[in-house]
Each structure stands twice: as C-alpha cells, then as structure tokens.
Amino acid sequence: MKELINSIGKKKLIMIFGGIVGVVVLIIICLLLYNAFFVSNTYSSVESKIVQAAMEYYGKHQNLLPKSPNDEVSVNSTTLTSSGYLGDLQEMVPDEGVSCAATVTVTNVNNNYRYVANLKCGDKYQTETFVNHVKSVERTVVTGQGLYDMNGELVYRGENPNNYVKFADRLWRIVKFENDSAMLILDDKYARSVWDDRFNTERNRNDGINDYSVSRANDALTNLYNGEDLFSASDKLLIVAHDLAIGKRGETIQYNDGSVEKSQVLEDKYIGLLPLYDYINVSLDENCSSASTQSCSNYNYLNLLESSWWLLTGDSDTTHRVYRIDSSGIIGLTRASTNSYLRPVIYLAKDAIYVGGDGTFENPYLVK
C-alpha cells in the first residue's frame, strides 16, 4: 500500500480524492436544485395553492360565503381554473400523467372562515382527514389500552395510548372522537381558579353555585378562548362549537354512557371542561364504575398531574359541590369556591387534515 502511494505520489492522491469529493458535492447540489425547481410541488403545497385560489375567488364573490356560524359552501377546482384563479392541476402535481380534482370547503367559524382543500389524484394521493387517518392506523380494541368503540364514540382508554396531539404549540390528549370530531384535553394544568365563588343562599356564604352555565369557570374559559394567550386566530379556525354536557350527577350513579351529564347542555361553546363520565370511561380498572370508586385513578392517562383539577360536572345532591380530580387521580367532591386547576377541553373540526405524527409523546399528531 505504501509503495502504491509512493508510486502515485501524495499530491496526485490528494488531487484524486479531492476530485471525488467535489463530484459528490456537485451531484448533491444538482439534486437539491432539481428538487427546488422541478419537483417543488408536493401534494401538500398544491393543496395550499388551491386554498389560496379559493380565498381569492371568494374575495371577489363575498356574497357566496357562508352567512351563519357552522354553515358551509364549496367550490371545485374546475370552477377555480375556468375563472382564472388556479392553474392546471395536472401540471402542478409532482406525478406525471395523473388526473386530479379538488374541492375547497369553506366553513363559517364564529364569523371567520376556514378553508379546507380536498385533493384527489387517482391512486397517487388523497387528502386525509385527521379522524380518517386515526381510524386507519388505530384499530379498535376490546382489551388493553387503545381505542374503544363505546356508546357510538371512539374513546381512548388506558395508561398511555398513542393519543398525543400538538396543537396551538401545546400538547393535548385525544379523549375521544364524537361524531368524527376529536375531543382534546390539555395535557397539563393551565390556570388555577375557583369553579365558582358566588353567594350560595342555602349555605349562607360564598361557597359558590354548581351551575356551570353561570360559573366563574365558564367565564374564565370563555375569556381564555376569546383572548390570545392560548389560541391564535388561525388555531381558532380549527376549533368548533360543541354542546357541553353540564348535567349534575350523584356520587354513586353508575350510568357512564353520558346520559346523566347530557340531560342538560350548554349549547355552542368553543371551550369547556371534562365531564365526569369521560374520566371514568378512560380508566381500564374493572372496578371503576362511579365517582365514589377510587380505583378510577388506575390505568388512566388523565391521571398525570401532581395537582387537583376541575371537572365539568356538579353534584346533584347539593348546590355548592363540584367534582374534581385530586393530585392522586381520585375523583372527589369539594366546594366550588375551592381553588384547583383548569384543564381546557376543545373539539377539533371533523374536516381537520392530518399532517404528520403517530400519536406518541415523542412524535405527536399534527393537524391543520
């Protein structure tokens, strides 16, 4: 080897090695430039261009926008192209010879507008909603942690299922899918607050009143949603109004299908707290059946805080007590005027689009 190096010469060897490195670097640069200029249109970027075209279209045709909250309208790619707002889809997508079509749905969200493109390109690509993606990778189970079919809802149960979502720059857990809308709870405590501290005539003191519709907790969460501390304007476009199940419940009641809590609802709220029955259903402990069962803290991914936090549900046997989860994950009743943490609960739009992730803590789901 030494003789070979001497025969070639060290300088020539360095030049040869340098030339090889240079060629490799040149190839890499060429590939990057090719990707930048010729394969820049990923399907996701095409969806973004379709949405931009729809925004320009409705900017010129504002009379066609949905008038009332939750109303929807749609426009297809053929209309956008023929009107001059969008180029030929077949020339925009990364795969040649693929026939594509798209529809943009516009939803009135609290008098703002959410635009969602649904792009289909043969068997090469199909826009995937978040709920459809989860259903395709998370088969429902009947034992162990995971996604369960319960009372017509898809409910995550167990100690640590893959139900993490990164949204509004924070981690959330998917509690369940209800009518294809994901119910999320913040995976941390947010703000310490009384549930309510109004004067209670039965108690003759400020122990609070356990009616969520007129509670301090409702006021605090409504202000939180309306502000910008937790959600940006674009975040709010993905949050949909939902009827909160605020029915009161006794400690020993064992109906966990939501019928008790849903006996009274607070309509069209964008943010709330977790109803008692949802906490009970998350636990896999076979003895967990009511609020009086301490074992509901077992095998329960919602039992993760070292502080107490409020539930949405009031006590049906009193006018001042409310359910909360203590620092050990045990369900208990306490005065509404006590301080505990709020864990906001929201619902994502059923047409929220899956962007990435596998639901683990290290790689949470991403949506748009």
Label every model-predicted segment:
Residues 66-103, 221:
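Extracellular/periplasmic head regions of type IV pilus-like filament subunits
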